[in-house]
């Protein structure tokens, strides 16, 4: 019997919507990363993007455990000397709550062109509304 290998033409992608209200950041991010890669499918192939589209709503209501709300720090660098910036979880949640889930999921995806293609299938919204109703997403309970 020949081993099955998925090709981009044979991959079928579904749309799922995930509600992050009251969910723990790491636990929801790992499940999203698995679904974006397509590892939940029997036709998973490591070198082909077999994952689904994921819409995350209520990103502003995601939680972290322990003292991470105050102690967790996100860093970015401009590329210039002395250009490092840091922001705490609490401030980032108030300013750009979508970025918290995006950074957590992006770190769990492969680095390179395939990982960037997988990351493009993630749509994160701070509130409960999203503009992907035409795709008829299914509710994914995590």
UniProtKB/Swiss-Prot annotation:
A GO CC annotation given for this chain: cytosolic large ribosomal subunit
One Pfam family this sequence matches: Ribosomal_L13
Signal peptide: none
Record-level GO BP terms: negative regulation of translation; translation
Highest taxon listed in the record's lineage: Bacteria
Matches recorded under InterPro entries: Ribosomal_uL13, Ribosomal_uL13_bac-type, Ribosomal_uL13_CS, Ribosomal_uL13_sf
Keywords associated with the record: Ribonucleoprotein, Ribosomal protein
Gene3D superfamilies reported for this sequence: Ribosomal protein L13 (3.90.1180.10)
Molecular function terms from GO: mRNA binding; structural constituent of ribosome
Classification via CDD domains: Ribosomal_L13
Purpose of the protein: This protein is one of the early assembly proteins of the 50S ribosomal subunit, although it is not seen to bind rRNA by itself. It is important during the early stages of 50S assembly.
Subunit organization: Part of the 50S ribosomal subunit.
Family under the similarity heading: Belongs to the universal ribosomal protein uL13 family.
Protein name per its UniProtKB record: Large ribosomal subunit protein uL13
Lineage: Bacteria, Pseudomonadati, Pseudomonadota, Gammaproteobacteria, Alteromonadales
């Amino acid at each position: 019997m020949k081993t099955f290998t998925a090709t981009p033409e044979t991959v079928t992608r579904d749309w799922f919507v995930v509600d992050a209200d009251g969910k723990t950041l790491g636990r929801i991010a790992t499940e999203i990363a698995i679904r974006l890669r397509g590892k939940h499918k029997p036709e998973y192939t490591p070198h082909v993007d077999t994952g689904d589209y994921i819409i995350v709503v209520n990103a502003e209501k995601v939680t972290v455990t322990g003292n991470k709300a105050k102690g967790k720090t996100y860093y970015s660098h401009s590329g210039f000397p002395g250009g490092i910036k840091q922001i705490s979880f609490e401030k980032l949640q108030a300013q750009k709550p979508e970025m918290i889930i995006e950074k957590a999921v992006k770190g769990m995806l492969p680095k390179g062109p395939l990982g960037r293609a997988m990351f493009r299938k993630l749509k994160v919204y701070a509130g409960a509304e999203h503009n992907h109703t035409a795709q008829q997403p299914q509710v994914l309970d995590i």
